[in-house]
């Protein structure tokens, strides 16, 4: 039986994370006294509602079987400031994605060694920064980002961008801020 304040299996979910506040010895119970739990379900539901609102406003129909990836570079808590939603529609010798930026959101500076990508602004507003030059994209505008080119983007009111590129490889995003590169839990 659990001891007082001990977390149990009922406290665990893929939408929860535990963090120790003190050292926990072998066979010691994980309790509210030596750790804390963060529940992410409500935040993830809020993000999903925000994304659905933008998709509805843009009148875009997505395939029913598509999975939404939440890219949260500095953690879910800072997602509304730094992050992006990614829907991968095709990833073969070529790749097609829809990238959704929420209002006020920044996608931090990065570059790719293997892939070249082109962005088409389909909805909203987007400022793309390429090698320290700001480009305020217009609806329907296409910008190509060559291999090795540092790029970041932001949106004031929210945006949907179609990305067409070479094959997406999970080891081909190199962020200028090393804290992001060291974060193994930046995708949900």
Feature annotation, model-predicted:
Residues 2-9:
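Extreme N-terminal basic, low-complexity initiation segments
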Residues 12, 154-188:
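Double-stranded beta-helix
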Residues 12-94, 180, 186-188:
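A short, N-terminal "cap"/entry segment at the start of jelly-roll beta-barrel domains
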Residues 97-113:
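Conserved short histidine dyad/triad with adjacent acidic residue
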Residues 119:
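Structured binding elements
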Residues 132-150:
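Short acidic-glycine-tyrosine-enriched beta hairpin
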